[in-house]
């Protein structure tokens, strides 16, 4: 099976990922060392590596595939997503230490879905972590912002990663 070039060369470890901020590198390294993450809100322009960072973290934390729920919120964005998929997934015990719900393009979620998700984040914080990626963090309700560690990813100078 052929893979896209971007998938073949996607960074899989912290040392592969090109950070624009050394403090962010150190933060990610500490999460990997501790084998735990808080709820995360990864923001930045399209193509800055938000989803790549999320997937790299899941790989580095050795999260079992059965403990990962990936959702593209630009395709599924309403409250039924939270009620049907996220609640069911997050309310069961993980195979490992915790589950991860990756909501890619979370800024597409409706405000009602976000409000509902807030309760799920609170109720299942011991067994599930949320990683939200978004281009427009102002579209995420304050209640979600307050429950996530914000992580803005700046655009990388192309020469920083083409040299690798």
Task: Annotate each predicted stretch with a short phrase.
Residues 1-164:
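P-loop/Walker A NTP-binding region and its immediately flanking N-terminal helices
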């Amino acid at each position: 099976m052929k893979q896209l070039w971007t998938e073949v060369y996607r960074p899989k470890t912290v040392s592969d990922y090109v950070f624009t901020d050394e403090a962010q590198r150190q933060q990610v390294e500490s999460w990997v060392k501790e084998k735990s993450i808080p709820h995360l809100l990864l923001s930045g322009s399209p193509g800055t590596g938000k989803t790549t960072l999320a997937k790299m973290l899941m790989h580095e934390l050795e999260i079992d595939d059965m403990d990962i729920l990936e959702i593209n919120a630009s395709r599924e964005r309403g409250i039924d997503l939270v009620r049907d998929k996220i609640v069911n997934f997050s309310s069961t015990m993980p195979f490992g230490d915790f589950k991860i719900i990756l909501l890619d393009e979370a800024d597409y979620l409706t405000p009602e879905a976000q409000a509902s998700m807030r309760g799920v984040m609170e109720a299942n914080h011991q067994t599930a972590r949320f990683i939200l990626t978004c281009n427009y963090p102002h579209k995420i309700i304050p209640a979600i912002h307050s429950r996530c560690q914000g992580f803005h990813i700046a655009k990388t100078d192309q020469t920083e990663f083409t040299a690798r």
